Amino acid sequence: ITLHRLAELVLPLGWFVPVPPGEERVTVGGAVGADLHGPNHHRAGSFARHLLAFELLTADGTVHVVDRGTPLFDATTGGLGLTGVVLTATLQLQPVATSLLLTGSARATDLDDLMARLCDADLRHTYASARVDLLARGAATGRGTVLHADHAPPEALPARLARRPLAARPQLPAPPQLPPGLVPQLTPDRPLGRRALGLLHDLRHRAAPRRRAGTLRGLAAALPVLDGGHALGRGEGTVAYRCAVGHGCEDVLRHLVRRVADEGCATRPGLLKRFGVGSPGWLSFPARGWGLSLELPARATGLTALLDELDEEVAAAGGRVCLARDSRVRPELLDAMYPLLDDFRELRAAVDPSSVFTSDLARRLGL
């Protein structure tokens, strides 16, 4: 079952999933394998924090009941499906009083302003993230918009909605999108591409209100926006890059954003989050600090060299890339990014010595 469908089933009963997915296709088993995180990580942590137990089918055909605090639990949450197949899961849901969110936003002039506003939003709100303009340079490098939301209390609903506070709400229109096919024609490696995209990003930034609060939106419409699902445009072929660095590594984050902006290869905004307490998962991605998500055109000139450079800087700072979205990180950097990698390999060899459950990523990285 997908988390989206689970949320549809439990919301009328006054419950909601503890970590909302950014898209509809994420299954419960997939959320376990990726140790899913969302725009509420600064408060709620990742999916494993709300997972009480699960049943796991291992390669020898045995079904294990896996409880929290065990090595198999820690290897499987974030383990990318390499320890076995999750058959059932016992999950702690979160209570909600309505099916609506109170949303808001704040515009930031540069990356330091954006980080400061995101820190403030994390203290005040359940969900928070920030869109980063990756084409702005100079004094405006890293400018963007902080987005935040909270579950609306019944008293915040107008009378027509208060009569059925938990009713499913129709999806509201998404923010204006570029016409299909336009973004690929404006990618930075084509004539006028960077200038045209830069102008579009600039217009969008200037059109955004300096501050907005108290806008009611349905859960299904608001949460994908907070997780970057409605960011401006999508290229016809992109490489996902997700990295995390700890608190105190803000200079590293500044350099990553500046390098991408200087290359001018981004076609859509990046997504910045603050991560809270990390998960016990041995290969779990989120760790206390900052998370940056990028979608870059696969055909961008020099992209491989750029991402290799970012990998090295992230690893040197004690950070990591997200393996659930990776297709290219070099194996020799993995030990620095995931200190418990050898523990994972040892346990996986014990429960699946013939590598019945494997993947291209596992073979490439020697997991």
Curated annotation (Swiss-Prot):
The record's annotation in Gene3D superfamilies points to:
3.30.465.10, Vanillyl-alcohol Oxidase, Chain A, domain 4
Which superkingdom does the taxonomy of this entry point to? Bacteria
Query: GO MF annotations for this entry?
Result: FAD binding; oxidoreductase activity, acting on the CH-OH group of donors, oxygen as acceptor
**InterPro entries, per the entry:** FAD-bd_PCMH (IPR016166), FAD-bd_PCMH-like_sf (IPR036318), FAD-bd_PCMH_sub2 (IPR016169), FAD_lactone_oxidase-like (IPR010031), Oxid_FAD_bind_N (IPR006094), Vanillyl_alc_oxidase_C-sub2 (IPR016171)
Cite the Pfam families for this sequence: FAD_binding_4
Domain FAD-binding PCMH-type: residue ranges? 1-96
Q: Which family does it belong to?
A: To M.tuberculosis Rv3790.
Instruction: From the Swiss-Prot or TrEMBL record, give the protein name.
Output: Uncharacterized protein in mprA 5'region
The organism of origin for this protein? Streptomyces coelicolor
